[in-house]
């Protein structure tokens, strides 16, 4: 559970994470509202907004360092600019596919603050949560952060990646508050 308590009534079942994203775009964003996707990204995240009548706004990551090592980082200024321009949703992947990085609590908290300030929902793909290989790191669910507004937070996950059972076709979409 990664220290995050989820009630059964907060969970909906869908075939996969991608259909969860399509459902959230269709139900919780305005027609034509842009969808923010930090890049690099899992390619279908860049295609699904267009299939749902929305523009995809790519926000390229920035290169930074942590403890002297290079790393990909979210461009929080770019995300904020896209939110201020009227974006309807931020798609976040944590751990970040394809860069394989676990987002730290400072980044998650910054995203939560932006989401709340602009009223922009966050769809978080956490399908890779069980695959953190660095023993010094651990996955922190975005929705578990104190600033993540439950009315603006959607978390998708599935056993398909961590346990290599994609044929099962059973993802979980977790939402609470008015997001349900």
What are these regions (language model features)?
Residues 33, 54, 117-121, 126, ...:
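A short helix->loop->beta-strand "cap" motif at the edges of active sites that frequently abuts
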Residues 144-180:
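Active-site PLP attachment segment
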Residues 45, 111, 142:
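Aromatic/hydrophobic pocket-lining residues that form π-stacking "cages" and hydrophobic walls in ligand
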Residues 62-137:
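Active-site phosphate-binding strand-loop segment of PLP-dependent enzymes
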Residues 1-34, 177:
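Phosphate-binding glycine-rich loop
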Residues 15-26, 37-56:
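Substrate-binding/gating loop at the entrance of the active-site cleft, primarily
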């Amino acid at each position: 559970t990664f220290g995050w308590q989820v009630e059964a009534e907060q969970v909906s079942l869908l075939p996969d994470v991608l259909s969860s994203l399509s459902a959230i775009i269709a139900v919780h964003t305005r027609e034509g509202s842009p969808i923010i996707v930090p890049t690099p990204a899992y390619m279908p995240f860049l295609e699904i907004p267009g299939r749902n009548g929305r523009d995809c706004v790519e926000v390229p990551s920035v290169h930074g360092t942590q403890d002297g090592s290079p790393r990909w980082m979210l461009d929080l200024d770019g995300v904020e600019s896209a939110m201020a321009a009227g974006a309807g949703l931020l798609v976040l992947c944590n751990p970040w596919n394809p860069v394989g990085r676990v987002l730290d609590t400072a980044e998650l908290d910054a995203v939560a603050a932006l989401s709340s300030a602009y009223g922009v929902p966050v769809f978080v793909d956490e399908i890779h949560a069980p695959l953190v290989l660095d023993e010094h790191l651990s996955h922190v669910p975005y929705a578990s952060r104190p600033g993540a507004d439950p009315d603006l937070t959607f978390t998708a996950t599935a056993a398909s990646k961590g346990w290599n059972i994609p044929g099962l076709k059973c993802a979980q979409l977790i939402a609470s508050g008015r997001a349900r």
